[in-house]
């Protein structure tokens, strides 16, 4: 288990955002359809899930290629 104050980093394609992200949305929609489970989520959806699980200081730092993957950092409260 992650101790209080521990940090979690999520790096994956996320739904929504600038125009290049739409291609990523479509790609991962087909990917998850082929895998029969999962879906892309927006950074806001992921933030809400993290906060519900007790994480704080949720942030989304800028990445070099946001159309491929995004990053969310959170700290366990």
Curated annotation (Swiss-Prot):
Q: Which GO terms describe its biological process?
A: carotenoid biosynthetic process; chlorophyll biosynthetic process; methylation; photosynthesis
A Pfam family (short name) is Methyltransf_2
Which keywords does this Swiss-Prot/TrEMBL entry list?
Carotenoid biosynthesis, Chlorophyll biosynthesis, Methyltransferase, Photosynthesis, S-adenosyl-L-methionine, Transferase
- Write down the top EC class of this protein: transferase
Give the reaction(s) catalysed: demethylspheroidene + S-adenosyl-L-methionine = spheroidene + S-adenosyl-L-homocysteine + H(+)
Q: Name one GO molecular function term.
A: O-methyltransferase activity
Q: What is its EC number?
A: 2.1.1.210
Report disulfide bridges, numbered on this chain. none
- PROSITE patterns assigned: SAM_OMT_II (PS51683)
Biological function: Methyltransferase that mediates the O-methylation of 1-hydroxy carotenoids. Converts hydroxyneurosporene to methoxyneurosporene or demethylspheroidene to spheroidene. Also able to produce spirilloxanthin.
Q: Which family does it belong to?
A: Belongs to the class I-like SAM-binding methyltransferase superfamily. Cation-independent O-methyltransferase family.
Q: What is this protein called?
A: Demethylspheroidene O-methyltransferase
- Lineage of the source organism? Bacteria, Pseudomonadati, Pseudomonadota, Alphaproteobacteria, Rhodobacterales
Encoding gene per record: crtF
């Amino acid at each position: 288990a992650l101790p209080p104050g521990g940090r979690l980093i999520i790096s994956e394609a996320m739904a929504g955002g600038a125009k290049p992200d739409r291609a990523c949305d479509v790609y991962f929609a087909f990917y998850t359809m082929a895998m029969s489970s999962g879906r892309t989520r927006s950074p806001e959806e992921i933030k809400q899930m993290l906060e519900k699980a007790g994480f704080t200081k949720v942030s989304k730092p800028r990445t070099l290629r946001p159309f491929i993957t995004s990053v969310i950092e959170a700290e366990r409260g």
